[in-house]
Amino acid sequence: MESTVGPACPPGRTVTKRPWALAEDTPRGPDSPPKRPRPNSLPLTTTFRPLPPPPQTTSAVDPSSHSPVNPPRDQHATDTADEKPRAASPALSDASGPPTPDIPLSPGGTHARDPDADPDSPDLDSMWSASVIPNALPSHILAETFERHLRGLLRGVRAPLAIGPLWARLDYLCSLAVVLEEAGMVDRGLGRHLWRLTRRGPPAAADAVAPRPLMGFYEAATQNQADCQLWALLRRGLTTASTLRWGPQGPCFSPQWLKHNASLRPDVQSSAVMFGRVNEPTARSLLFRYCVGRADDGGEAGADTRRFIFHEPSDLAEENVHTCGVLMDGHTGMVGASLDILVCPRDIHGYLAPVPKTPLAFYEVKCRAKYAFDPMDPSDPTASAYEDLMAHRSPEAFRAFIRSIPKPSVRYFAPGRVPGPEEALVTQDQAWSEAHASGEKRRCSAADRALVELNSGVVSEVLLFGAPDLGRHTISPVSWSSGDLVRREPVFANPRHPNFKQILVQGYVLDSHFPDCPPHPHLVTFIGRHRTSAEEGVTFRLEDGAGALGAAGPSKASILPNQAVPIALIITPVRIDPEIYKAIQRSSRLAFDDTLAELWASRSPGPGPAAAETTSSSPTTGRSSR
């Protein structure tokens, strides 16, 4: 689960900012000059374009060949005949720019050969799985960071204009796959197989490469998230919701994005964070037991369900179904997200395999530790409000319970105003208004104001749980005073809160891979309490209540002894304006350009690319993906 987004980005010369509403770029032909200044002229303010095509050589060149026109620097024509130039994707070969360093495919090997032309390429097991990579990695693999790879790529080009963000990320992922293969952690031939799929993007695509094969592989391999060292390694040099900042003009990438998420171990956890880590599985169990259907329960009648085989790592618990690893955006490879719950089937290799043109529902789970009260404390106002809620089960009792703490999780703001960024859930319903509610005017960006208007009509669903049955060791939902099992409240997600921004980033990443499957995001709020002495050490089985919901869930769903006793589950749909995705994409390209130029300007003179020490083992060539 991602950490929350921080405050708006601090002012700084190198922070890239652009308006949220972006006009389309003017089309530029292949002969157009680059828009940005010389590489050592900082800061950069525009996105670079491909260099003009290099002069044509007098020798005949097969136009269908994907090999570089010129050999890498310091590589002479005396190379042996069996050392082929490194094969590139069609898009990369068409783009201009110098070739990459002379990077061996394996220790003692030669240049990376075209996977399609290598007769010794091993046959890949048709049942290979992305989830077989162990959680712990050897130190030499942990050293294969994106920053180190990027610096190695710069040693092999004559100008940073030759390297684009998407190509750089795909080249890194491909090289990492080969390293994993050499270490025996994935099937032989998998690295080349993934690159063959990646370079077969549709010719009409902007980058003419297909990022999903590589990026989907790593998403499937990192579903254990924080318990997986590969997950931590991939997040290094990747901008996530916790490191992306939001200013008045939209998303701001930190100048230090390449250094972000550098720690392979989680920071020291606060009690609130630990409460969330322990009880996120609780919320997941409740969600799948009562509210959300599983995507692995089978398809519609007549559908080819063999394609949609539910697949999870063998060490994932039942309550962790539909969890996601780190998925990188398919536009620039600069942004990553690890969704808590994505209701999407997977294929036999572990890849996300949504039904075409079907909405993708995903859920971001937040466990509110500030409601974790001691029910045995008679002086606690929250405990008293809880007793009243269990006795009456009315909307009035629920609102009183939510307001029983100093900073309630639902914040009221008057119509015509905008909410502050303090709470993730807000409402304009007069029933939630309090006598001491603040009527102050707040400043708000036009984009946030538009998102408030877009979400103001959303209604949340609230599921209430009764006290545990100590005789039968069960917990079940209870009906409200109206007789309904689900209460609909006019409460919506606050676009100014970090939780909303996190969901926005997740939607952007999903949309980049599945544009024909509109994302349907939700914010799930779990409220639970501490246990009484009689409840300590007891595992409670989840059962249906009176008027049970129709969604079938796993029969073995339960609440473990270390988890909180559930009180309520609030499910809030979230509406996102896809126009914001353009701002994220533009800002990510600008941030990459600025960082690349800084690395270029600060590089030290060294040997040519053929002798330079690099970490890449990729069977690609270094060309711009733009």
UniProtKB/Swiss-Prot annotation:
> Which intervals carry biased composition (Basic and acidic residues)?
73-86
What's the EC number here? Answer: 3.1.-.-
- What subcellular locations does the record give? Host nucleus; Host cytoplasm
Keywords of the record, alphabetical order, are: Endonuclease, Exonuclease, Host cytoplasm, Host mitochondrion, Host nucleus, Host-virus interaction, Hydrolase, Nuclease
InterPro entries, per the entry: Herpes_alk_exo, Restrct_endonuc-II-like, Viral_alk_exo
**GO molecular function terms noted in the UniProt entry:** DNA binding; endonuclease activity; exonuclease activity; nuclease activity
SUPFAM superfamilies membership: Restriction endonuclease-like (SSF52980)
Query: Which stretches does the entry tag as region Disordered?
Result: 1-127, 601-626
The record's GO CC annotations read:
host cell mitochondrion; host cell nucleus
Composition bias type Polar residues, residue spans: 59-68
EC primary class = hydrolase
Residues marked Required for function (site)? 280, 340, 364, 366
User: Could you tell me where the Low complexity compositional bias lies?
Assistant: 609-626
What does the UniProt function comment say about this protein? Plays a role in processing non linear or branched viral DNA intermediates in order to promote the production of mature packaged unit-length linear progeny viral DNA molecules. Exhibits endonuclease and exonuclease activities and accepts both double-stranded and single-stranded DNA as substrate. Exonuclease digestion of DNA is in the 5'-> 3' direction and the products are 5'-monophosphate nucleosides. Additionally, forms a recombinase with the major DNA-binding protein, which displays strand exchange activity.
Q: Which family does it belong to?
A: Belongs to the herpesviridae alkaline nuclease family.
Assembly notes:
Forms a complex with the DNA polymerase, the DNA polymerase processivity factor, and the major DNA binding protein. Interacts with the host MRN complex composed of MRE11, RAD50 and NBN; these interactions may help in recombination or repair of the viral DNA. Interacts with host MSH6, a component of the post-replicative DNA mismatch repair system (MMR).
Q: What is this protein called?
A: Alkaline nuclease
- What organism is listed for this UniProt entry? Human herpesvirus 1 (strain 17)
